[in-house]
């Protein structure tokens, strides 16, 4: 027997073909959501309040401080919030202190700051009753970036950008004449020396002394026509504020507010970290030759001689002298004068030999920012100086350019940070209001409550959850869709890219994605590469960079240890990493002398003693969904992409079956998705019911078991998911079972025995049959319909509300005008459908009448009024009816009344919701797929007796076209087919993990073990004639899923329906009950056939000839001849449009007489009045 047995949860055992031991458990897969939100509640909010307080008024008399905050209990639990269509939130209260600096009086008060949406255990938010997910956003990290530019003459230039988290950009660039320029906040460019003068280095000499002599600086100084700091400040002011009278003071305050004010300019933690890392001496001096000796400032000892090359060892030796807190080497303090800031600037500089000088004599000055501390969030003059120094160094090939698509330069903004940014906007709006109120109100009697207006804060949070591009309606088709949605990374959204502007490079797979972002799972279409998925083992660090785990290799012994280090993309660039499948001996050392490994973007073969790290697992490259595809290594990546995406569209079936050939990820994905019920504490099952499971906690105290509390776990029964599929949980534990923390107590939708079960294991043959599986179509046996193998349950929600109108309130009633008793048979006394009733298209669900405007009564109506009194009141029927294709069984009805204290939108008195459930069997036109991107539409369902059968008489379930395999290169499906057949014969489930699964030889051996031929082909007999087919056929078990694209949702036909108001043409699309567009090319087709009358009919009476179409309808009903068509409405619209452009357009008849449009219209109105239709109103 090949492989070993692995237990997944309580119920499932699989034979795994994995050869590599798992060193690291998979992390909790929705940690990216929950951890980020916890950070926000613990630290993010506190940071915000610290940033904003104290708020002082303009005179400095009053100051308002935010001391502490607390979150109360949510008003409704999660389930009730969903049911009542409200947000699941908790009240946020803040302790505020108001200090009167004149009198010294202090007032403390707790202020309510609005309700704050809470995250559920499963990483989602309930907003207005709907479950939503906040997708993490991939953005460029704030830092300084250098890039190489080649101009149109092929000359090399350098560009640099300082990007903050928020605030003005600072850009440096060179031009064809070798002059260095700066742009401040995307304005016109200025010579770079103007900025240096404005910082307080006024003369040419000072600038040259500071940055060192070089030709770029010389050219720039020649171009610069300002001579001192004052002129430079005025020059900058004129660029930033053209048209305003410049003064030195204004210029200084403008620059201070643009760059040096922490409220306006923010690099954030991550920006400061990246900036210090980029401008640090270490990487800049590597492999350079010193132009001055490095001396210990304390002792005067020479550590490195002039002319020595700073290789790794020497660099490590001098680092302590460059980095220590005091007496650093090369540190100097500059005192700028007349500049923006008068403060002293601490920098660090080292002289090296210019590597581009052939004689090796010219010196370069490398200036560092003197290690600005991590708590300085704004840019400092030292940062600007050292980034300009780096810029000039780079022109002499010292330092390196940055790749902006590298994951070391892109970071994630998860829920917590996105919320924090939104909250900050609300708070800063509130701050303005507080300041204004401070100056208006009486300072002696004012309280904090009177100053604070919480509206802007609430509004900004509401706006974020309700309408941000990153707050999305959760994909709840099945648990995998739910899980993937929570782990999604989007480069779109506010502050990100746009689809149209994103180029090819951003979308492409980058070497730094390895183990961080899945190279497979991304949508097809305009968003390809902009929306990605987090890899299975990846984590996000405190700066928002994605880290991947690696096993450390002990440098002394060469052993691969089980010590795991999480590395970010730029940390990993310093190491050589071996693949997870490198063979190890018993001592955990590499078997081979030479090992295939990765270093930055290259795959290299190196000797084993040079390796620093080793991959944790072969599946760390791919995402949770991709890791569910067995034999992924045998599929072409384009098809694997489709396979990963289509699994998310699988509809939950009535009788789910876990795959016979799995990958071992099914259990983890099911458990972490949030669809299953998970046990929170160790214990014993006391009671199991369909709707709840009771667990008695058990803890060990002094070696004895002690019983604790009884926990109740509620189960969701037949609820509607966001996508209208059925969300149902079934217990999989029994009374008396011992359970541990984290164990699955109940399966969710699309789960079986704790494992993800998206489809069914069916017997598949690769063969053609009468041409029915042409173009990927699928032929299916009727058994799958009869036995409900692919039957799914769908629940749709319909609602009707009774509002107050100008003419009086609407009423929900059984008394509906002009409706027979037959239509009311399933309604109760209030006019609401009874639960359990079977309804079809057009049936009434909720009877409702709306008051009509009072019209002039005819004589007969007046007589009726006189006889029956007020009975014949004017109401019209506005009942809620079942739409086309919406028929089914009424599952549940919910009624909300304003009188009962239910929260309803303004103007609504009563709300009724009806849930209709449909049981959809599979039929022709439904879309199905395997896990390898092999998708198709069912073209024929054959009776069982007509299906080809095996020698033992078993008819096969599905026939697929063999031509779908070779050109698509998804051979994984063939391996799955064979291994599945062998596993079914042996009565086992197997696991073939990605990149470490069953090899070809393993499959053949398992087939032999099952007593089958090695090529896994078999003779098939035609079910109709009983004769054997000419050739043997590959038959086996494949896991096939039914996708959410069902023909019932798409099939549509229209007789008459609504028309567009302006053109009077039928609307388009199923949702609007629209027609089919007969376009330009279709018109040509009918012209080619000479079918003039058909064409005229289609363009007039079937479309927008308003009177003609009613006359035609009348003629058909009465059996008369169809009348002559009139003038189409769109033709009149065209004429009007041309006339509105000032053209004189006239219509002429065949004998050249002018036709007056007005007369035509009057005739139409007369005809319309005869026919009793309203031309003005669209039908």
Swiss-Prot record:
Source organism, top-level taxon: Bacteria
Enzyme class of the recorded protein, top EC level: transferase
Reactions it catalyzes: RNA(n) + a ribonucleoside 5'-triphosphate = RNA(n+1) + diphosphate
Record keywords: DNA-directed RNA polymerase, Nucleotidyltransferase, Transcription, Transferase
GO CC term (a single one): DNA-directed RNA polymerase complex
EC number: 2.7.7.6
CDD domains in UniProt: RNA_pol_B_RPB2 (cd00653)
Keyword Aminoacyl-tRNA synthetase in annotation: no
Disulphide bridges: none
Gene Ontology molecular function, alphabetical: DNA binding; DNA-directed RNA polymerase activity; ribonucleoside binding
InterPro entries in the cross-refs: DNA-dir_RNA_pol_bsu_ext_1_sf, DNA-dir_RNA_pol_bsu_external_1, DNA-dir_RNA_pol_su2, DNA-dir_RNAP_su2_dom, DNA-dir_RNAP_su2_hyb_sf, RNA_pol_bsu_bac, RNA_pol_bsu_CS, RNA_pol_bsu_protrusion
Keyword Metal-binding: no
GO biological process: DNA-templated transcription
Subunit structure: The RNAP catalytic core consists of 2 alpha, 1 beta, 1 beta' and 1 omega subunit. When a sigma factor is associated with the core the holoenzyme is formed, which can initiate transcription.
Function: DNA-dependent RNA polymerase catalyzes the transcription of DNA into RNA using the four ribonucleoside triphosphates as substrates.
Family affiliation: Belongs to the RNA polymerase beta chain family.
Protein name as annotated: DNA-directed RNA polymerase subunit beta
Name of the gene: rpoB
């Amino acid at each position: 027997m090949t492989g070993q047995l692995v237990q997944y949860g309580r119920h499932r055992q699989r034979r795994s073909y994995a050869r590599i031991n798992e060193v690291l458990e998979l992390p909790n897969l929705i940690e990216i959501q929950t951890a980020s939100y916890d950070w926000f509640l613990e630290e993010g909010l506190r940071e915000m309040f610290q940033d904003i307080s104290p708020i002082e008024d303009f005179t400095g008399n009053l100051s308002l401080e935010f001391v502490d905050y607390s979150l109360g209990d949510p008003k409704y639990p999660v389930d009730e919030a969903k049911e009542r269509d409200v947000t699941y939130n908790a009240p946020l209260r803040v302790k505020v202190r108001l200090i009167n600096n004149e009198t010294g009086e202090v007032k403390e008060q707790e202020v309510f700051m609005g309700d704050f949406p809470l995250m559920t255990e499963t990483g989602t938010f309930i907003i207005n009753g709907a479950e939503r997910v906040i997708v993490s956003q991939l953005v460029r990290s704030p830092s300084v970036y250098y890039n190489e530019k080649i101009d149109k003459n092929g000359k090399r230039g350098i560009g640099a950008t300082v990007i903050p988290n928020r605030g003005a950009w600072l850009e440096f660039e060179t031009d064809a004449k070798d002059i260095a320029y700066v742009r401040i906040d995307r304005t016109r460019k200025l010579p770079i020396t103007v900025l240096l003068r404005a910082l307080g280095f006024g003369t040419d000499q000072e600038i040259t002394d500071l940055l060192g002599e070089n030709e770029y600086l010389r050219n720039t100084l020649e171009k610069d026509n300002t001579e001192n700091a004052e002129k430079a400040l005025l020059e900058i002011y004129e660029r930033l504020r053209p048209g305003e009278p410049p003064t030195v003071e204004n210029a200084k305050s403008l620059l201070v507010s643009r760059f040096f004010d922490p409220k306006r300019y923010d690099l954030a933690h991550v920006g400061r970290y990246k900036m210090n890392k980029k401008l640090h001496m270490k990487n800049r001096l590597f492999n350079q030759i010193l132009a001055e000796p490095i001396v210990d400032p304390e002792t005067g000892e020479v550590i490195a001689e002039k002319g020595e090359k700073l290789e790794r060892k020497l660099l490590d030796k001098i680092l302590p002298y460059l980095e220590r807190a005091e007496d650093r080497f090369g540190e100097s303090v500059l005192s700028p004068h007349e500049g923006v800031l008068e403060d002293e600037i601490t920098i660090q500089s080292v002289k090296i030999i210019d590597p581009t000088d052939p004689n090796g004599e010219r010196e370069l000055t490398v200036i560092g920012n003197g290690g600005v501390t991590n708590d300085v969030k704004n840019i400092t003059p030292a940062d600007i100086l050292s980034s300009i120094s780096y810029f000039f160094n780079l022109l002499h090939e010292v330092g390196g350019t940055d790749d902006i698509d590298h994951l070391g330069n892109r970071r994630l903004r998860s829920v917590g940070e996105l919320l924090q940014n939104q909250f900050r906007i609300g708070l800063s709006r509130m701050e303005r209001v507080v300041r204004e109120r401070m100056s208006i109100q009486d300072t002696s009697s004012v309280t904090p409550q009177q100053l604070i207006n919480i509206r802007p804060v609430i509004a900004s949070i509401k706006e974020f959850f309700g309408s941000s591009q990153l707050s999305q309606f959760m994909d709840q088709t099945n648990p995998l869709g739910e899980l993937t949605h929570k782990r999604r990374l989007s480069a779109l959204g506010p502050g990100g890219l746009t689809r149209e502007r994103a180029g090819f490079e951003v979308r492409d797979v980058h070497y730094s994605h390895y183990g961080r972002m899945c190279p497979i799972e991304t949508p097809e279409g305009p968003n390809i590469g902009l929306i990605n998925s987090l890899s299975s083992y990846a984590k996000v660090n405190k700066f928002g960079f994605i880290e991947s785990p690696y096993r450390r290799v002990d440098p002394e012994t060469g052993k691969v240890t089980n010590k795991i280090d999480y590395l970010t993309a730029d940390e990993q660039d310093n190491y050589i990493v071996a693949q997870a499948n490198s063979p190890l001996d018993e001592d955990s050392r590499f078997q081979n002398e030479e090992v295939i490994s990765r270093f930055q973007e290259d795959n290299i073969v190196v000797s084993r003693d040079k390796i620093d790290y080793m991959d944790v697992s072969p599946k760390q490259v791919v995402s949770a969904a991709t890791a569910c595809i067995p034999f992924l290594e045998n599929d072409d990546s384009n098809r694997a992409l489709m396979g990963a995406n289509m699994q998310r569209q699988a509809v939950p079936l009535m009788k789910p079956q876990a795959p016979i050939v799995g990958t071992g990820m099914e259990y983890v994905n099911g458990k972490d998705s949030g669809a299953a019920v998970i046990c929170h504490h160790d214990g014993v099952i006391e009671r199991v019911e369909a709707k709840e499971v009771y667990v008695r906690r058990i803890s060990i105290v002094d070696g004895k078991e002690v019983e604790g509390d009884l926990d109740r776990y509620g189960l969701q029964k037949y609820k509607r998911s966001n996508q209208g599929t059925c969300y149902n949980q079934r217990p999989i534990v029994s009374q008396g079972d011992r359970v541990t923390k984290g164990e699955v107590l109940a399966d969710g939708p699309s789960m079986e025995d704790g494992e993800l079960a998206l489809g069914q294991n069916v017997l598949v043959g690769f063969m053609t049959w009468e041409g029915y599986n042409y173009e990927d179509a699928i032929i299916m046996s009727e058994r799958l319909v009869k036995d409900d193998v692919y039957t799914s349950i769908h629940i749709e929600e319909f609602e009707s509300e009774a509002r107050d109108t100008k003419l009086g309130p609407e009423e929900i009633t059984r008394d509906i005008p002009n409706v027979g008793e037959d239509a009311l048979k399933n309604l109760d006394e209030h006019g609401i459908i009874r639960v359990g009733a079977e309804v079809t298209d057009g049936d009434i669900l909720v009877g409702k009448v709306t008051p009509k405007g009072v019209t002039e009564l005819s004589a007969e109506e007046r007589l009726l009024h006189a006889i029956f009194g007020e009975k014949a009141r004017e109401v019209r029927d506005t009942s809620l009816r079942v739409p086309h294709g919406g028929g089914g069984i009424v599952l549940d009805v919910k009624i909300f009344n304003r009188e009962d204290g239910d929260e309803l939108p303004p103007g609504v008195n009563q709300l009724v919701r009806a849930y209709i459930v449909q049981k959809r069997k599979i039929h022709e036109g439904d879309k199905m797929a395997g896990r390898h991107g092999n998708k198709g539409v069912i073209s024929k369902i054959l009776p069982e007796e007509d299906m080809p059968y095996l020698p033992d008489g078993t008819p096969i379930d599905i026939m697929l076209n063999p031509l779908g395999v070779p050109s698509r290169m998804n051979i994984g499906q063939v391996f799955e087919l064979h291994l599945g057949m062998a596993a079914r014969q042996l009565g086992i489930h197997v696991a073939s993990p990605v990149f470490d699964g069953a090899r070809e030889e393993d499959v053949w051996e398992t087939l032999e073990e099952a007593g089958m031929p090695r090529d896994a082909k078999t003779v098939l007999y035609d079910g109709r004639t009983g004769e054997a087919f000419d050739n043997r056929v590959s038959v086996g078990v494949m896991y096939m899923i039914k996708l959410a694209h069902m023909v019932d949702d798409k099939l549509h036909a229209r007789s008459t329906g609504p028309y567009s108001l302006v053109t009077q043409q039928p609307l388009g699309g199923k949702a609007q009950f629209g027609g089919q567009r007969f376009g330009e090319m279709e018109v040509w087709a009918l012209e080619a056939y000479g079918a003039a009358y058909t064409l005229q009919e289609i363009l007039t009476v079937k479309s927008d000839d308003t009177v003609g179409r009613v006359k035609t309808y009348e003629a058909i009903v009465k059996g008369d001849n169809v009348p002559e068509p009139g003038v189409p409405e769109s033709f009149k619209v065209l004429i009007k449009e041309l006339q509105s452009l000032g053209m004189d357009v006239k219509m002429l008849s065949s004998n050249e007489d002018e036709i007056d449009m007005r007369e035509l219209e009057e005739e139409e109105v007369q005809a319309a009045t005869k026919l009793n239709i309203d031309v003005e109103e669209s039908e």
